[in-house]
Amino acid sequence: MPKLIKIKKGLNLRMIGEATGQDPIPSIPSRDFAIIPDDFCGLSPKLLKKEGDHVTAGEAVFHDKNNPEILVVSPVSGIVSSIVRGARRKIEALKIEADSQQDHVKFDAEKFADIKAALLESGLWAFFRQRPYGIVPSPEATPRDIFISTFDSSPLAPSHTLLIDNNEECFKKGVEVLSKLTAGTVYIGCRKENLIETDFSESFILSGPHPAGNAGTQIASIRPVNKGDVVWAIEPETVVKIGKLFTDGYVDWSCVVAITGEAVKKPTIVRATEGICISALLKDNVNIDKSPRIISGNVLTGTNVGPGGYLRFPFRQVAVIPEIINDCEMLGWASLSPKKYSASRTFFSWLAPKTRKYHFDAKINGGERAIIMAGEYDKVFPMDIYAEFLIKAIIARDIDKMEQLGIYEVVPEDFALCEFIDTSKLELQKIVREGLDYLKKEMN
């Protein structure tokens, strides 16, 4: 029986708008897709295609300037309709108008003896995430271990069976492939009710609140990252794609997406293709009266993309919540309303049943202020790290302190709950991302 790990620190946000107990709606039709280079942290994109060029699903559209063998590929076949650039000509998006009939790149099975080359050529390498730094790993790197979290514990997240999309055999084949990339162990984090075991991995059962499903929490609980260590994390959906590649010779870029949130008329599960436009996913299913904020991802770590945006990595959830439910609320936080949610028992709602769900909006109820050293991060931060002191060291750009306090173990998503409960209203995930980028620049 796999070892049980109990995560005691954390917080489950019980939000209205969960999509549960449904088979995915058949593929959502759309011709508007985009690839967002910011989804592949650590890469400096160099375009391989220009506007008007035709691409096939699985064909490379850009590569990394520093490691040209790392390719990012198109999820659909079609015409490159637009290349969106921002400040200093930074590539913000590469838009593709999909063909009516899709064609996939086929890969030569004889090349699969070189696993690394196959993953690089197929574009799946870009979906690995390395710790330290939370970036796409270098092809020269060899991980100490590889971690797979098979469940998502974030608010309104889709279930385990939807993440793997009922492709357990492809998942197990993907794990077998991953086991050949490391001299260490492939660790799989599971919930007790959805245990997965293979001959090429070691499974752990995790219980407890969010962030139990985060790879960082599982790494810290199973085998923490020390200075000099390199470990990789990968999403379960990508493991299925790897298994599909090594079984059938092509990559299936479809995904299952949970459409969730209070501002959605009917929370549902749909089948789509990675990078699809948000307007197609949400067609006639948003309550405009609630002035919705459309988030690609979950409400803690997702990106505010708006109605004209696109589905972003990890391509599994869209959350739509009201911008502000009540802009002129009498007494505000001092109202002590039992209907209001509080992580610190400010309101009497903490006496309500654990099954009760709450209304959440995008209002932050205050502005940025000095850090209050009250140990509030520690209540929801399950790692053996002094989170508040680490944040202060990052802000000060004190590399020695950052290393001593465990920056090599963390990535921005590990601080999402801390950001949610933060009295100081700091953008902690942005601070951590900038700190990791600074550290990487100084140490390499």
PLM feature segments, named:
Residues M1-L48, H63, S203-L206:
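N-terminal, Lys/Arg-enriched amphipathic/low-complexity engagement segments
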Residues M1-L13, P24, S81, G86-D103:
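Mobile cofactor-carrier "swinging-arm" domains
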Residues I70, V84-N444:
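Buried, small/hydrophobic-residue-enriched core segments of structured protein domains
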Residues P29, C41, N66, V264-K266, ...:
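Residues that act as N-cap/strand-start positions at coil-to-secondary-structure junctions
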Residues D39-P45, V55-G58, N67-S82:
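Generic structural motif
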Residues I36-F40, K50-G52, D64-N66, I83, ...:
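Acidic/polar N-terminal loop/beta-strand segments that form early-domain functional surfaces
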